């Protein structure tokens, strides 16, 4: 017979263990009646399958000041024999949010699923003009979604959803740069997400892509987004490229659903979401040199990075003084990496348009 590929078995066993449902996963090879039988030996966690998780985010930059967020999530897994899950989340801090989600596979292999979810969010949106923060709006809303989809093994997922939404976009402080909105609408959403990056943040190899399309006859617009990223390593140097398009195949994107530029590795010279607009195209490439590891207790490599970015905005909603600029540019240098608590980085971005930004997360 064929030689046993132990490396493939080890990889699949690690993937099963990585699901988080098992205390241990092992395997053994048995010989019965001139046949070799591979037996997988999973042991379910005795303390599961319920999980309570917490996350803390702290960031600051020279244009927006500091913000923070504390998030808690309760996940109840394996609520039936097909692997149904319930996820409840709540977030407080500079932004507020809460959500409840039910995910139900339709077959033992979990190739097909249905999902229902409801969420509320209240986000502070700073409005910029001439690189100065001139107003702050509150972008809040509630959304209910019913979805059906399919999983492509470890490659990714495709889903089709019907979404009911209500949105409020109201000025909180500052000048009236944008009109207030209060609206309710519904529509279809199709999404394809494929991910083969070897890490969630600061990957060293692989690729990912996301295609997202939302169409609402009620609101009179459609929103399309394409996001592609790839990474590879040359020794201790990691090269990563990313491209994104956000636009409106039908109508014009409303302010509360606009494309966004600004923030770390999304035109780093600008503050987070400093530029709102429609028909936005972005491309960026960065090189990172692994220069060491984080101090004791913090796993992960430490990197010194340099990024070059460019973008074109068809219609500006903020920073309208840039409307005559064909291509926006940004360059950034930073120090950071991935830790058990998430990504951490410190850096500086600059654009020849006059924008600059120190950032820490």
Describe the residue ranges of each PLM region:
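C-terminal transmembrane beta-barrel domains of outer membrane proteins
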Residues: 71, 87-88, 101, 207-361
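Face-selective signature of the C-terminal outer-membrane beta-barrel domain
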Residues: 156, 162-164, 205-215
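N-terminal periplasmic "start-of-domain" segments of outer-membrane beta-barrel proteins
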Residues: 1-2
């Amino acid at each position: 017979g064929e030689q046993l590929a132990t490396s493939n078995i080890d990889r699949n066993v690690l993937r099963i263990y990585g699901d988080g449902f098992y205390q241990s996963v092992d395997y053994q090879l048995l010989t019965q009646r001139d046949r070799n039988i591979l037996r997988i030996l999973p042991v379910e966690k005795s303390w599961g399958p319920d999980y309570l998780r917490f996350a803390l985010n702290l960031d600051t930059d020279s244009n927006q000041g500091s913000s923070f967020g504390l998030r808690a999530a309760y996940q109840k897994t394996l609520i039936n024999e097909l692997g149904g899950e319930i996820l409840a989340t709540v977030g407080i801090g500079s932004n507020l949010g809460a959500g409840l989600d039910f995910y139900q596979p339709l077959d033992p292999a979990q190739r097909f699923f249905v999902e229902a979810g409801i969420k509320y969010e209240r986000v502070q949106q700073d409005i910029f003009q001439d690189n100065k923060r001139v107003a702050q709006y509150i972008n809040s809303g509630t959304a209910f979604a019913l979805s059906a989809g399919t999983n492509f093994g470890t490659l990714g997922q495709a889903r089709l959803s019907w979404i009911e939404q209500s949105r409020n976009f109201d000025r909180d402080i500052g000048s009236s740069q944008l009109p207030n909105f209060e609206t309710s609408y519904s529509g279809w959403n199709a999404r394809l997400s494929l991910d083969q990056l070897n890490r969630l943040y600061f990957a060293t190899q692989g690729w990912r892509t996301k295609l997202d399309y939302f169409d609402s006859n009620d609101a009179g617009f459609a929103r399309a987004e394409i996001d592609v990223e790839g990474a590879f390593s040359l020794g201790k140097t990691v090269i990563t490229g990313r491209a994104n398009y956000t636009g409106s195949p039908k109508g014009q994107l409303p302010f509360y659903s606009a494309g966004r530029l600004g923030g770390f590795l999304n035109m780093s010279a600008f503050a987070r979401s400093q530029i709102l607009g429609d028909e936005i195209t972005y491309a960026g490439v960065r090189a990172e040199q692994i220069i060491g590891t984080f101090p004791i207790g913090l796993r992960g490599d430490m990197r010194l990075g340099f990024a070059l970015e460019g973008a074109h905005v068809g219609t500006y909603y903020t920073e309208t003084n840039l409307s005559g600029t064909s291509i926006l540019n940004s360059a950034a240098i930073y120090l950071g990496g991935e830790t058990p608590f998430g990504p951490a980085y410190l850096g500086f971005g600059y654009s020849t348009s006059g924008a600059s930004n120190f950032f820490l997360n």
